[in-house]
């Protein structure tokens, strides 16, 4: 029997890098990752068939890809030795070959007899080495129109036992189907062969490219269960997909990173950059900086886009000095920062710095020949709106026009968002007037901001009028629109209208996302409609949407507020069992729920679990704990929490002192209330109405006591 030589392994796309993190104190071996379908195939490619006729494909066999010298050599070899056009003509003799994976294939079993034409074909191709079949299939799959023909070739090869590396052929097909957004067909095809590392990797890549992260992660887990190691390229694709679809969060990324470490995968440059950017995009610049330092220590220069993403994350976190330092590092490396890099730093100045810093940044851009874009101007408008300088914001609009940057709906949406965040929702009408005067037509994003503005300030009639106007202009609402409307109706107690909006959303073909379900779960919980809430959770899971941290936090909150503490604890345990880490917000909700019912012991236990999970106690959690002791008439323990706060660098706020005064009043220790009030003032807290009311109540009772004596 002729043994066909397997194609050589292709090297990774980038230079390799392996991190030794502080978790490991010994060296690891370098592991070569399993090959993936698209990197394992020989790089030669054949011309794709024209959609109009199959004959054009047969006549264009000579037109091989000439991008690489070795491609030319290999394709010339193919041309000299083998002509596949008779086979392709035979398979397409009844017309264009359609991709029919869900039907029973006629060629699965080896035939007992053949017609003379097919017999001659089989004999003529019996000696073709496997790499040439790989090249043929890769060529056919380069065009969607010839995917059916590619599958027909693979089926024909199996039928006649002409190739002994079908897993690679199937991997090429699966990869091509994923690239053509035919994920369903890719899964059907994968079922026709036992999954191997090659086909696993191809299928995971197809899922990631189609943003079906849940399936990709499930396949990686199943692959590991079967004793195979995932390809590092797949992790890159998964992280890129999460980043691209804005679904990435630090907890999920950390879990993926630990998997990579545990599997001792060799990290390539692309994966390192993807991980760093992923942490930055997920709002965890500290982890991104840590990994950047590790990468630079190995001599790796991060991509400009990676550095800009960290600068942006630092700016979002208000860490402007660190963002400045990284921006300067970018400049000193010889790279001329472009508009996007300046915008990332400008965002930090708008968020935390004085207005002059934002203005000087824009001036510096212009001096260095970097043209401001609409995002630059919108950030500067944000800065002026934050400073209450509406006229200056209008001047920026005029500057945009003078600089040939036409103000668009996005700029006006930022202007409106600034007024919304400052509580000046009445200026909405002024913005609309200004927008109309220069001929800018509102788009979906602008309408979403308008609806959100009206919803936040309980102007629900205005919100619905805006929604109707949006529809009348032919602008289809997106998930943000529906979520905003549903949420604002829920928050103002209009649960029936919210439910109607949820149903209308589905009727119009807009599929609810995790955020939508979380809003409705909270609505049902507030109404104590537990059966409806569980039904909705089931529906959410049936649609492939996994409950996230917000879902579990919402469940803990609504269960806790209703005294269903066993259900709340069950949610916490379920969350941990699926690898999600409970957040401080979740424990705050549980502690507060116990506090409202005076269950101080349970509140303390929840607090202990919180700290044992590695979460730093927040001011909110500690205030809730003080409230729990106060409700349980345990004022000594309440003041012990205050002492704990002082010793651990948590600054008490007005809520802390007000809650302590309430605890003293509850146990009739009125004479101590003025002392707490005075300490509050001395600590720099400004008393609010509730604090002053507590003091008056205590003084009034003390006065009555003196009179009675």
Curated annotation (Swiss-Prot):
Q: Where are the PPR repeats?
A: 196-230, 231-267, 268-302, 303-337, 338-372, 373-407, 408-442, 443-477, 478-512, 513-547, 548-582, 583-617, 618-652, 653-687
Transit peptide, from-to: 1-54
Please describe what happens when the gene is knocked out. Seedling lethality under normal growth conditions.
Q: Which UniProt keywords apply?
A: Chloroplast, mRNA processing, Plastid, Repeat, RNA-binding, Thylakoid, Transit peptide, Translation regulation
A GO cellular component term found in this entry reads: chloroplast nucleoid
Query: Which GO terms fall under biological process for this protein?
Result: chloroplast mRNA processing; chloroplast organization; regulation of translation
Highest rank taxon of the organism: Eukaryota
Q: Which family does it belong to?
A: Belongs to the PPR family. P subfamily.
Q: What is this protein called?
A: Pentatricopeptide repeat-containing protein At5g42310, chloroplastic
Organism, by scientific name, is: Arabidopsis thaliana
Q: What is the lineage of its organism?
A: Eukaryota, Viridiplantae, Streptophyta, Embryophyta, Tracheophyta
